[in-house]
């Protein structure tokens, strides 16, 4: 499943090829994603300009500005900015093609992007959403930017891990009173967002914390170590293009390679890179957890 680093890698890869372009056409081949693609999506998007691409947790947010003629025409939804919310689900990818190959069975949506007002020399490209398992989502919302935090899919997300406010004290307050294991508490995403399964195991290793430790019993000092480890792990993963375990590729088709140097994830039985103790694997909430019984306590 694409986690925060993979979504951020996708966002950064799209920026130079997508921002400022006009949506000339929308082709929806399959509407049966996690939530059905609305029948009006083609009409809502065609003619709009992609202004910005933001990220909130694992959601990509594409700002879709109204065409100039709609703005001049007056008020109404067509004359107001809106946002396209994209979630990659378990197997989704967004890729940019100058000349796209023939669509396959899992290529569900294309945005045909022409030159925009500020990209007059740009050649047309296609932004294609592919998702073999169809757990991804493409949703339109007419909300203004100031109202986006209140969107039902975004309102309960925790703080971003790169937000300056996220530190050990924030983590310590958020975990206070929680009896669940620290790994489960991090995966919940309501204290800090985007620390998925791979990066949770890796962050806990770097912080020296066993994943079964009760979240509410972590001291402030250990939370400070964990907050630093979360940031460092995610930043390193982004710099390495994310992790490609099965389906993920960036917007240009390139694979990530963070997984090649993981300390514990998917290394059950192999020696710890620090102490040589065999890495252990357990199940927590039906998900695999990896840790070193010597380095983590």
From Swiss-Prot:
* Annotated protein name in UniProt: Formamidopyrimidine-DNA glycosylase
On subunit structure and binding partners, the annotation says: Monomer.
What's its job? Involved in base excision repair of DNA damaged by oxidation or by mutagenic agents. Acts as a DNA glycosylase that recognizes and removes damaged bases. Has a preference for oxidized purines, such as 7,8-dihydro-8-oxoguanine (8-oxoG). Has AP (apurinic/apyrimidinic) lyase activity and introduces nicks in the DNA strand. Cleaves the DNA backbone by beta-delta elimination to generate a single-strand break at the site of the removed base with both 3'- and 5'-phosphates.
Positions of FPG-type zinc fingers: 263-297
GO MF, one term, reads: zinc ion binding
Q: Which UniProt keywords apply?
A: DNA damage, DNA repair, DNA-binding, Glycosidase, Hydrolase, Lyase, Metal-binding, Multifunctional enzyme, Zinc, Zinc-finger
Q: Which residues form the active site?
A: 2 (schiff-base intermediate with dna), 3 (proton donor), 58 (proton donor), 287 (proton donor)
* EC numbers on record: 3.2.2.23, 4.2.99.18
């Amino acid at each position: 499943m694409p986690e925060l680093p993979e979504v951020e890698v996708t966002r950064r890869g799209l920026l130079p090829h997508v921002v400022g372009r006009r949506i000339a056409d929308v082709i929806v081949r399959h509407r049966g994603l996690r939530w059905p693609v609305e029948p009006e999506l083609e009409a809502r998007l065609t003619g709009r300009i992609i202004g910005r691409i933001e990220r909130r947790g694992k959601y990509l947010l594409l700002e879709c500005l109204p065409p100039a003629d709609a703005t001049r025409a007056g008020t109404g939804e067509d004359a107001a900015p809106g946002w396209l919310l994209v979630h990659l689900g378990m197997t989704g990818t967004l890729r940019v093609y100058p000349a796209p190959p023939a669509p396959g069975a899992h290529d569900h949506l294309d945005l045909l992007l022409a030159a925009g007002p500020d990209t007059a020399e740009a050649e047309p490209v296609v932004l294609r959403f592919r998702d073999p398992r169809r757990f991804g989502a493409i949703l339109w919302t007419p909300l203004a930017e100031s109202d986006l935090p209140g969107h039902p899919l975004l309102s309960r997300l925790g703080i971003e891990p790169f937000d300056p406010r996220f530190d050990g004290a924030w983590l310590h307050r958020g975990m206070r009173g929680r009896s669940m294991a620290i790994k489960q508490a991090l995966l919940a995403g309501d204290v800090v967002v985007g620390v998925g399964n791979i990066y949770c195991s890796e962050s806990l290793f770097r912080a020296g914390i066993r994943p079964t430790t009760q979240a509410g019993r972590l001291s402030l000092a250990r939370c400070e170590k964990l907050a630093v480890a979360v940031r460092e792990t995610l930043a390193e993963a982004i710099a390495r293009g994310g992790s490609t375990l099965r389906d993920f590729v960036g917007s240009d088709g390139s694979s990530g390679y963070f997984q090649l140097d993981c300390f514990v994830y998917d290394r059950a039985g192999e020696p710890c890179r620090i102490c040589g103790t065999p890495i252990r694997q357990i199940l927590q909430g039906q998900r695999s957890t990896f840790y070193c019984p010597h380095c983590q306590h």
